[in-house]
Amino acid sequence: LNLLLPHEDDAVIWRGPLLAKAITQFWQEVLWGKLDCLLVDLPPGTADIPLTVMQSLPLSGVVIISTPQDLANMVVRKAVHMAHKLNVHISGVVENMSYLVSPETGKRIELFGRSRGEEMASEAKAPLLGQIPVDPELAALCDSGDIERYNSEPFTSLSSAFIQALPAPSRPAEDQTGK
């Protein structure tokens, strides 16, 4: 929604019903064309937006993103429980900001505490798709708008695991045979 506002630092001050209407409108009135996959980035937690998306959109699955911090894990655990209660399939778990590789020694430093990715994946009954390190190069490329230039082994492995976790696209039989 931020892209629809006059200024990028304008706040979206909407309550639940207006947010739900906007989500429904995006889903029903945007001409998405033929999609193999539509990714929807949601705010953390179980508030109006994630709840509306999980209840209103025909989801084939969700990917849970967490970080090692205790507070983040508590919030994410609630989202996992919400997905289970709403019978939404959890396709996988990703742990962001999992560690930093020291440029001097090459040693992994767990800036935000020990990894909890495996525990979260176990609780979610889903595979751990990967762990994303804190990487100053990635931050710089994001800020400069050049993220497509980023290349790292952890990110490549995560991308492959993420693609494998996605459901196979539904295509007519003639498309699958190459005709």
Could you say what each language-model-derived stretch is?
Residues 4-6, 44-46, 68-72, 97-101, ...:
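Conserved nucleotide-binding/hydrolysis micro-motifs of P-loop NTPases
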Residues 14-21, 37, 44, 48, ...:
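Charged, alpha-helix-enriched surfaces in structured cytosolic catalytic cores
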Residues 22-37, 49-71:
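Inter-motif core of Ras-like GTPase G domains
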Residues 23, 42, 55, 91, ...:
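Glycine-rich phosphate-binding loops of nucleotide-dependent enzymes
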Residues 39-40, 94:
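Hydrophobic residues in beta-strands of the RecA-like P-loop NTPase core, especially within AAA+ ATPase
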Residues 57-95:
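Helical hairpin unit composed of two closely spaced alpha helices linked by a short loop
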Residues 80-179:
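C-terminal lobe/tail of nucleotide-utilizing enzymes
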